[in-house]
Amino acid sequence: MGDITVRWTQRLDGETADAVRELLAAASAADGVAPVSEQAVLSLGEPGAARHLLAEHDGELAGYANLVPAHGDHPAMAEAAVAPARRGRGIGTALVREALAAGGADARVWAHGDRPAAKAVAARLGLRTARELWQMRRSLATPQLPELVVPDGIVLRTYAGPADDAELLRVNNAAFDWHPEQGGWTQRDIAVRRAESWFDPAGLFLATDTAAPDRVLGFHWTKVHADEQPPVGEVYVVGIDPAAQGRGLGRLLTLAGLHHLRERGLGGVLLYTEADNTAAVNTYTKLGFAPAHVDVAYAANGA
């Protein structure tokens, strides 16, 4: 079987980062689902809090895990992938065991798509389900989208550039102060995404009050996955200022983005939401979305 070694590093050199990207692409192609999140991919080339665990088999890269340390009330979160040609050798189990041990109390590991291999690793290590994230999808052709009607007192506009960033950050961090990945954003988080090839200012919608046009009430950031065939849109982030809740802004902003994506000629759209976020699930269900697959975060029993 050959020797398997694992080692941690705080920062990847360019060659190793490229090798990890190739491994992740191969795993995604083999499984039909990305093995790690967008944030984990971005961290490959960016200095930051994330740590990187590399597994080598016979001297070649065979697996990768990303670990974001615990911060505030949020436990450490890991994600892992194994090269398709190197599976069945215990590499996934070794990565998950080491990542959870390094993450400390209540550390968790994502299983994107919760595939049979991930379930087997969880069972082998005695892990429990700690969190579920649903991917929901709908066609943009049928059922027909509801009409977009902007109520009196609300202005709906698109992103005007970095001048909007302070308000965008304020609303995001207020809306997601409870969220381990989406909360606590900085200017850097927006700048990195603005530099991505998919970024389109015409697809980032902001709602303001006519009485206070400089204060953002909520936003909807859309995204297009051009690498999928056919391309698919995404309800990337919908954030509402807690002080503006109860005004129907979530539905309004979501609809604005859906109409925009349909006008771009896309046939389908996806989104991610916490399975236990009943209000969000109900809103999206009423807009024609249905669960497509589930991502599961596992933790050690008793953690």
Swiss-Prot record:
Its EC number is 2.3.1.189. Acetyl-CoA 2 binds at residues 238-240, 245-251, 277-282. Keywords: Acyltransferase, Repeat, Transferase. 1D-myo-inositol 2-(L-cysteinylamino)-2-deoxy-alpha-D-glucopyranoside binds at residues 38, 181, 223, 234, 272. GO terms for molecular function: mycothiol synthase activity; protein-N-terminal-alanine acetyltransferase activity. Acetyl-CoA 1 binds at residues 80-82. It catalyses: 1D-myo-inositol 2-(L-cysteinylamino)-2-deoxy-alpha-D-glucopyranoside + acetyl-CoA = mycothiol + CoA + H(+). InterPro entries: Acyl_CoA_acyltransferase, GNAT_dom, MshD_Acetyltransferase, Mycothiol_AcTrfase. The keyword Ligase does not apply. It is an enzyme of class 2 (transferase). GO terms for biological process: mycothiol biosynthetic process. Residues 4-141, 154-303 form the N-acetyltransferase domain. It comes from the Bacteria. It holds the Pfam family Acetyltransf_1. Belongs to the acetyltransferase family. MshD subfamily. Monomer. Catalyzes the transfer of acetyl from acetyl-CoA to desacetylmycothiol (Cys-GlcN-Ins) to form mycothiol. This is Mycothiol acetyltransferase. It comes from Nocardia farcinica (strain IFM 10152). The lineage of its organism: Bacteria, Bacillati, Actinomycetota, Actinomycetes, Mycobacteriales.
